[in-house]
Amino acid sequence: MKTKLIVVAGPTAVGKTALGIELAERFNGEIISGDSQQVYRQLNIGTAKATPEEQAAAVHHLIDVRDVDESYSAYDFVTEAQAAITDIVSRGKLPIIVGGTGLYLQSLLEGYHLGGKVDQNQVLAYRSELEQLSDQQLFEKIDSSGIEIKEINRRRAIRALELYRFSDNLENTETCYEPFIIGLDDERSLIYDRINTRVDKMVELGLLEEAKWLYDNFPEAQSARGIGYKELFPYFSGEQTLDEALEKLKQNTRRFAKRQLTWFRNRMTVSFYQISSPEYPENVIQDLAIFLNEEEGEK
């Protein structure tokens, strides 16, 4: 029997954290952060990390698990998220993954956990190679490899070819999770307004000081390449005015939100909800209750 879990996905600034906490309170859950930047200690404002008050409202996992000068990969996330899910379920609670890093979520949910002996850079390079092929070329590779998959589509073909190449046993690498993926969305202009407002609020909370500390101490770290920090470095070096740097930050965040939505729409099976709808979030809660009770209803 597969483990049921909830995923709250969507672009930045749509309220994923707030919904995740509400669902954790209603359904006896614990939250696993699915954000590539929130793993870093001392980076709180620019990563939009859950506040101490929010973390007190629901148990959070995979927040503050790396120092800012350490690297973090999709493989690290999958390995640690699997352990967190096992722990949460063992205590009779519901795992709720909250985040906007599409690669991390897809890697966990669709079985890209290929084992510690596999070079994840090789996996990603092979995935990039496959994505350059046409549908016909992909399906021909499936046929020539003798791989059997239940449903032929581009996403499943790429996944199957990866597993075939890097795993000794395709069946054993199948994901053991049954996710309900909640995608938060809204009118593009409203999302962009929320992003602009959020950046202004981050500045009020001390984003400049946080980014300056990172610039002074770890300017070459992986964590420093995240949106919210790198855009401010030209200001610190005197190459741009503060207004120019903040406008670039807002612009990059808006573009990132657009890429996030594209990823979730094209690469994952997501149930989308408009956050400005009068039915939200009750419609999410109702659908989730049905999903969680399906097993009992079948008995």
From Swiss-Prot:
Task: Provide the binding site for ATP.
Answer: 10-17
Tagged with keyword Nucleotide-binding: yes
Q: Which prosthetic group or cofactor does it need?
A: Mg(2+)
Q: Where on this chain does substrate bind?
A: 12-17
User: Region Interaction with substrate tRNA: what ranges?
Assistant: 35-38
Disulfide partners:
none
> Is Isomerase a UniProt keyword of this protein?
no
Q: What is its EC number?
A: 2.5.1.75
Q: Cross-referenced Gene3D superfamilies, in alphabetical order?
A: P-loop containing nucleotide triphosphate hydrolases
- The domain of life is Bacteria
Q: Where is this site: Interaction with substrate tRNA?
A: 101, 127
Q: Which UniProt keywords apply?
A: ATP-binding, Magnesium, Nucleotide-binding, Transferase, tRNA processing
One family from Pfam that matches here is: IPPT
Can you provide one Gene Ontology molecular function annotated for this UniProt record?
tRNA dimethylallyltransferase activity
GO biological-process terms attached to the record: tRNA modification
| Catalysed conversion reaction | adenosine(37) in tRNA + dimethylallyl diphosphate = N(6)-dimethylallyladenosine(37) in tRNA + diphosphate
Assembly behavior: Monomer.
NCBIfam families registered for this protein in UniProt: miaA
Q: Any idea what job this protein has? A: Catalyzes the transfer of a dimethylallyl group onto the adenine at position 37 in tRNAs that read codons beginning with uridine, leading to the formation of N6-(dimethylallyl)adenosine (i(6)A).
Q: Which family does it belong to?
A: Belongs to the IPP transferase family.
- Tell me what this protein is called: tRNA dimethylallyltransferase
What organism is recorded for this protein? Streptococcus thermophilus (strain CNRZ 1066)
Q: Which gene encodes it?
A: miaA
